[in-house]
Amino acid sequence: MYETLRKHIEKTVSLSDAEFAWVKSHFSIKKYKRHQFIIQEGETVGYSYFIVSGLTKLVHHDVSGKSHIIAFAMEDWWESDFFAYLTQTRATLSLECIEDTEVLCISLANYRKLCADLQKVEAFFLEKAHFGNIAAQRRILSLLTSNAKERYLQLLKQYPQLVQRVPKSLLAAYLGVSRETLSRFSN
């Protein structure tokens, strides 16, 4: 499980065995079942999660009770309610497992300690943050400038393996269309 994390980090920076042992000591392993919540709205967010196996959805529930899927995350991706995590405030998003999911968790204190102690790790997390911002910017621009079919085709092009795994009803909700409309896109 930790070897997956090492390979992920070493796509960005190289680590000696001693450095990785230090990194590894700051994470804990958690396992969740399908439909189980990793984070629930209203809770304090204690961790950022590296997904070793499984699939999750990040969801916001508006005042009328409607669910809005913000993102999906699968293996080799990081997920959390990052605002709540970094500010140590209550979550405005829920993170729910679509499949049985195994994660490596890092607390904010351990994250800060690792970044202070190992400049390489700080560089790694900075790059992850930059790519996360790019993904969020692309998502917003897509919502503003593309129709649902164009968003579906872009998602299919960028993340074909994700589209294959996410249930069609959730994919439709993410795209803001009915399941029937999504079926027409697929044909």
Model feature map: region roles:
Residues A91, N110-N147, R151:
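A small-molecule sensor/coupling module
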Residues V59, D81-F82, K113-L114, L155, ...:
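Residues that scaffold the ATP/ADP-binding catalytic core of kinase and kinase-like folds
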Residues K30, Y49, A71, E96, ...:
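Residues that recognize and position ribonucleotide moieties
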Residues F37-C97:
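Cyclic nucleotide-binding regulatory domains
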Residues S14-S16, K30, E102, S142-T145, ...:
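Localized chelating/binding microdomains
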Residues M1-S28:
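Cyclic nucleotide-binding regulatory module and flanking cytosolic helices
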Residues S146-N187:
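Phosphate-/nucleic-acid-contacting segments
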